[in-house]
């Protein structure tokens, strides 16, 4: 729902927390001396992209539903080499006017290639 607001927070978080001041993982895993700790945040950061921006939700061992949320100032976004649902696949999202062109590609074959309205779900079964 709040793609633009979420993108602003993601941009701020990325610049301050992930790209800003921190120490190597070996130190962060044992944060003595009040060192910043990123180990848990690193894993959760990926979920912002996969579950938030791409809206990926598993529906079975070989299937999922996703709802891409492309920020207004972006013209495209891609996830490459996703290893899930017993497949390795890509998701490509491009803005075409007021619609999104969304492709899912596995092993060089197009599984789905559709134009959708913002907020529309796409179901994929491998």
Predicted regions and their residues:
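Non-catalytic C-terminal accessory modules of carbohydrate-active enzymes
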Residues: 1-126
């Amino acid at each position: 729902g709040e793609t633009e607001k979420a993108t602003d927070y993601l941009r701020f978080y990325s610049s301050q927390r992930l790209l800003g001041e921190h120490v190597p993982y070996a130190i962060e895993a044992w944060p003595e001396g009040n060192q910043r700790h990123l180990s848990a945040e690193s894993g959760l950061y990926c979920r912002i992209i996969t579950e938030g921006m791409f809206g990926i939700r598993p529906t079975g061992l070989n299937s999922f539903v996703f709802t891409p949320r492309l920020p207004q100032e972006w013209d495209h976004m891609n996830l490459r080499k996703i290893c899930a649902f017993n497949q390795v696949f890509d998701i490509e999202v491009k803005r075409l006017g007021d619609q999104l062109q969304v492709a899912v590609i596995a092993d060089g074959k197009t599984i789905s290639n559709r134009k959708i309205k913002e907020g529309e779900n796409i179901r994929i079964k491998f």
